[in-house]
């Protein structure tokens, strides 16, 4: 159960991470997302 602010933060984080890494390390980004989701549950 996410709040809109949390979703916005995740989207911003993903966007910045994707541009920073130029999609060279998608698995690391996914791992970070999974860790964040576990923390938020």
UniProtKB/Swiss-Prot annotation:
It is found in: Cell outer membrane. Keywords: Cell outer membrane, Ion transport, Membrane, Plasmid, Porin, Signal, Sugar transport, Transmembrane, Transmembrane beta strand, Transport. The keyword Transport applies. InterPro entries: LamB-type_porin_N_dom. GO terms for cellular component: cell outer membrane; pore complex. It is a multi-pass membrane protein. One of its GO terms (biological process) is monoatomic ion transport. Porin for sucrose uptake. Belongs to the porin LamB (TC 1.B.3) family. This is Sucrose porin.
